[in-house]
Amino acid sequence: MMKSIKCLYAASLLAIGSTAAMAQASYTDKDGNEYQFKRHWFLDIQAGGQYTVGEASFSDLLSPNFQGAIGYQFSPVFGLRGQINGIWSKGGWNGYKATKDGTPYTASYKWKYVAPGVDFMFNLSNLFCGWNPNRVFNATAFVGGGINWAGANQEVNDLAANIKNQSNYLLEYLWQGKKVRPYGRAGIDLEFRVSKAVSIMLEGNANMISDKYNSKKADNPDWYFNALAGV
């Protein structure tokens, strides 16, 4: 996991050099008005929902999600933002049988998390169509990572207390207290310009984290997906 995140950061840092030449981009509209790109700060505030991949029904794995970010646009193509995302993830079972003839077991649980991180952002509209400050729609792809701080995992521990053989229910990574784990993520932002300073944003991101995140052993990383809207 850490190796993948380091490689991701290294590749993104190389991209800074390739986009730096575009930092002084200019644009002239049909009326002859000339615009010069200026480096600038930006702020994102978003809310939406999360789907945590698991064995429960789809609806039982949905939870509210919130994200805030502050970033800097270095060039028409490249930007960097620090973001923080949370606040719940979910897990569970839907008609799960520990043995072939066992009784179907259905339950769900949630826990809290806060995940600060850094995203390397690439404006695809400016990359392929050139910089245009009056463009109504922009698509931006991003990759990044950070630290996931998780806690309040009592619900699954309460369920486990009534399960005789926890390993049969995949609960080999049951945890309590607070856990800090690295994560990597990628996603896309779709921005609709409302004014010179404000855009409506739709975002989707996929997050990869340790297999231990949802307390279950699956021999592969855990995933959660966020769908967000904001400004």
Language model region names:
Residues F78-K164:
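Gram-negative (and chloroplast) outer-membrane scaffold detector with strong preference
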Residues K30-D31, V53-A56, Y96-Y109, S167-Q176, ...:
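Extracellular loop and loop/strand-boundary signature of outer-membrane beta-barrel proteins
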Residues I45-G49, G68-Y72, V118-L124, V143-I147, ...:
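Residues on the lipid-exposed face of transmembrane beta-strands in outer-membrane beta-barrel proteins
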